[in-house]
Amino acid sequence: MSEHVLPAEGPMRFISPIIQDNPTGWGPYEMPDQFRDMPYQPFSKGDRLGKISDWTMVQDKKYQNKYASQFGAGSSYAYFHDEDESTFHLVDTTRVQKPYQSYQRGRARGQRGRGARGARTPGGMTTLNKPRERKLGKRWGQRGAPMKIRDASVTVRPTWVTIEDMDFPRLAKLSLPGIKEGEDIVSCGTLEYYDKAYDRVNVKHEKPLQRIDRIFHTVTTTDDPVIRRLSKTAGTVYATDAILATIMCCTRSNYSWDIVIEKIGDKLFLHKRDNTEFDLLTVNETSVEPPADDGNSINSPRNLALEATFINHNFSQQVLKSGPTEPKYKFQEPNPFVSEQEDGEVASVGYRYRKWILNNGVVLIARCEHDAVMQGPQGETQFLTIKALNEWDSKLANGVEWRQKLDTQRGAVLANELRNNSCKLAKWTVQALLAGSDQIKFGYVSRAQVRDNSRHVILGTQQFKPHEFAAQINLSMDNAWGILRCIIDICMKQKDGKYLIMKDPNKPLIRLYDIPDNTFESDASEESGDEQADTPFAPLYSYGNSKRV
């Protein structure tokens, strides 16, 4: 083998680099040619790339050094404000007083959709949501605004004995399915035909509401001659459609009301007290902000109820074809409440006395009402229930402007009425179902001027089938029958006597009282001797009595 011998290398030489001496500082003082005219920005490898928004200049108030950079990154894009005297001008700093209500609504919108625990405002303050606010308020002993105390419909006397309290959550779970359609026993009265020209009324072609001088009879159960006659041969429970609707829809009510129940043997008579506000229509009863209870205002609950009743009576008669030559629909018997002494014209109304079997020997007989009739598509006769919704002041009622929305967004208007008048609409629907009406027709009536509650205009009409409308407003007739049957069973277990069921004015429950037999009899005799001006309708409208419109 031969060995390879590497050639010998020469001695290594050190080549000294070119050193640039900078007598005034450190580092090179000349820019190499390959780096000349090249832009440069100080940076840190921990910084994110991007220049659309430089967040490195943001300082967290809790952690001051959270975004801090020791390399001066982003300083070339930082904004430094220089005062410009040329654009300086005075600004009017006068505070404008804003309505309290609008301010609250704005705050609610601003906080909606934020986190469950709270949200941070631009000023750095954390806002709590409502449940957390209430929880902290209770912890520290804080109290909110005082709850509005409503008056009871009747003063509870010391001699009354409370039998049972029935709260709304329990009543809402009751159900009595399988109740068949009512059977007609007696039919009375005369009905006029509906004028279909009012179906074409709209906001642009409104019609003024007229005052129709007709007599309305609001006779209670025990004063009805037909019910007195039927009680001898049929039925165990007797009432009117208005009384039944009030009981069946009690879970939707906020205002106080009362119904007198008399038990005689195995029979129950449900009736209302004389000269009360039972027949007045509530306005915005279920609204988040109900009308303020100011007796001097035209927008107080009582004055609004009088106005709504006035509108309903006149509207239900104005939309009919009235006149001596117009055809009329007559039932088998005449109106049982018309006497020979009455000199006025009686309103168009038909009475149906119907029977329902509620099982276990309970047979209900009730007087129901129709307002009009009309010809159906196939020429058949259809019975109508006619009611009117009234607009009083959309700003105070937290509603929508009917004149702006009614023609284009009628569904929104009706949805708002369902929120504000859920109890009233449910009672109207129950009355139409009990009477067997084929259609329920609503009229939209508004004030001609917001501050004038004596002049009104008709802005439109809308028609529904009662069963379809009941499903739309989530009204369960099985639950309604269950509530009625529950109250009937409790009363049937009591001894013979007089009882009163009353909605608590400030709690979601109804109470059943055992009252003396002579209760309200002395009140009726005293009220019968009062002047005519003390009737419920006298303060607003020049009615001769509580039955005339």
UniProtKB/Swiss-Prot annotation:
Compartment list: Cytoplasm
Primary location: cytoplasm
GO CC entries: eukaryotic 43S preinitiation complex; eukaryotic 48S preinitiation complex; eukaryotic translation initiation factor 3 complex
Claim: RNA-binding is one of the keywords in the record: yes
Basic residues: bias regions: 106-117
Any one GO molecular function term: mRNA cap binding
Domain notes: The RNA gate region regulates mRNA cap recognition to prevent promiscuous mRNA-binding before assembly of eif3d into the full eukaryotic translation initiation factor 3 (eIF-3) complex.
Family recorded in the similarity comment: Belongs to the eIF-3 subunit D family.
Purpose of the protein: mRNA cap-binding component of the eukaryotic translation initiation factor 3 (eIF-3) complex, which is involved in protein synthesis of a specialized repertoire of mRNAs and, together with other initiation factors, stimulates binding of mRNA and methionyl-tRNAi to the 40S ribosome. The eIF-3 complex specifically targets and initiates translation of a subset of mRNAs involved in cell proliferation. In the eIF-3 complex, eif3d specifically recognizes and binds the 7-methylguanosine cap of a subset of mRNAs.
Assembly, per entry: Component of the eukaryotic translation initiation factor 3 (eIF-3) complex.
Full protein name: Eukaryotic translation initiation factor 3 subunit D
UniProt source species: Bombyx mori (Silk moth)
Gene name tied to this protein: eIF3-S7
